[in-house]
Design a protein with these regions (language model features):
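A general boundary/transition motif marking the beginning of the first structured unit of a protein
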Residues: 23, 111, 143-144
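Mobile, glycine/GP-rich and aromatic-enriched active-site lid/loop segments adjacent to catalytic centers
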Residues: 51, 119, 136-139
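C-terminal structured subdomain/cap of oxidoreductase catalytic cores
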Residues: 1-3, 37-40, 73-132, 153-230
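Short, glycine/acidic-rich hinge or "gate" loops at secondary-structure transitions
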Residues: 133-144, 230
Length: 230
């Protein structure tokens, strides 16, 4: 696994090699496997993004007598696409320097919990099948003792984190709650547009990098007065 390459002497060599040649371990993706899957046959499109990595998520640089390595561990995680649970960002006060109130509201809706429980079970089936089975000694987390819905929900609530693709906090729309209009203009403020994924009414079922670029391109056209025909 990749943990071997995190030993400080090897890590330093690998970083230098990458800097000089553009090759080596740092040039590789940390994800060995990635795929879009459905949590149930009722889903008409994938609602989960499965990822596997050839290193422990908890791995850190190590060296004998300083810090012990993570060992020969692999990790798998699943992103919930287009979750039903919705968070909220609101102002704490009229002071523009005050930090906003942020409510992530993860796992508030049962469909989200159900999909992620199934994601754990799908992951177990993947690693208990050939050809992975001979290389797996045991499951470290959530552990074989976590079987029922209640146990899996408890583990999910303790470990779930953001996939760093936040959207929709300045959603476009025509209703009173919409922050921007169809031209990306902030309602009630002259000369201000928003040009990022916060204008999406809902998150897409995938990564947000490409949509963010397209929103930026569209915003540039709107500012310059360009239309599709020109």
């Amino acid at each position: 696994t990749f943990d071997r390459e995190l030993r400080l002497d090897r890590l330093g060599f690998n970083v230098l090699r990458w800097k000089l040649t553009g090759r080596g371990t740092p040039a590789q993706s940390p994800l060995t496997l990635q795929g879009f899957i459905r949590s149930s046959p009722e889903q008409d499109r994938p609602d989960l993004q499965f990822q596997a990595s050839h290193v422990s998520y908890a791995a850190k640089p190590w060296f004998p007598l300083w810090r012990k390595g993570a060992g020969h561990e692999i990790s798998a995680g699943t992103l919930l696409l287009n979750p039903a649970s919705r968070g909220r960002v609101s102002l704490a006060s009229a002071d523009p320097h005050a930090l906003p109130r942020i409510l992530l509201n993860f796992l508030a809706e049962e469909p989200d919990r159900r999909a992620l429980r199934e994601a754990i079970r799908i992951t177990r089936r993947i690693f208990n099948s050939e050809p992975a089975r001979p290389f797996i000694a045991r499951e470290l987390a959530p552990g074989k003792q976590a079987e029922g819905d209640e146990a899996l929900d408890a583990w999910l609530r303790a470990t779930v984190i953001s996939a760093a693709h936040p959207t929709s906090t300045c959603a476009m729309g025509t209703d009173g709650n919409a922050v921007v209009d169809a031209q990306l203009r902030v309602r009630g403020i002259e000369g201000l547009r928003v040009a990022d994924c916060s204008v999406m009414p809902r998150i897409i079922r995938g990564n947000t990098n490409a949509p963010a670029m397209m929103i930026g391109e569209k915003a540039a056209d709107l500012v310059l007065g360009r239309t599709a025909s020109t």
